[in-house]
Amino acid sequence: MLFRSRVFRKVWEMACWAGFLAGRESARLMLPHGQGNIFFTGATASLRGGSGFAAFASAKFGLRAVAQSMARELGPQNIHVAHLIIDSGVDTAWVRERREQLWGKEALNNPDLLMPPASVAASFWQLYQQPRSAWTFELEIRPFGEKW
């Protein structure tokens, strides 16, 4: 917890407050139509904190609570709210560069440690296509090589 309160607040604003605002405004537009979908993206930190990740974990825990509260409030109004926990990095150029900086080129050798964006999108699409008789609130996805 050796960081400034300003950093903690900024992380919370980006990872929790922004999600609340986006969800609120989305719901406001969907309610008159009597249907819709609002999906929040979580992370491993949505379920457990880690050393050095107090700000991020508290924000992701918070976003999960926002999503759950919105699901209970908006579900009866035919708006599907779900929280998707991504327990891994998503395979993008930025993530690959960051992994290489932190752990060297060998960090990129195992293709089973990052999720392709198309795989993540397929999970969101699966949620979107669900009939309301079997809505999922929370879905946790991870690549084959991720330890849990």
Predicted regions and their residues:
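Catalytic loop of short-chain dehydrogenase/reductase
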Residues: 37-62, 68, 72-75, 90
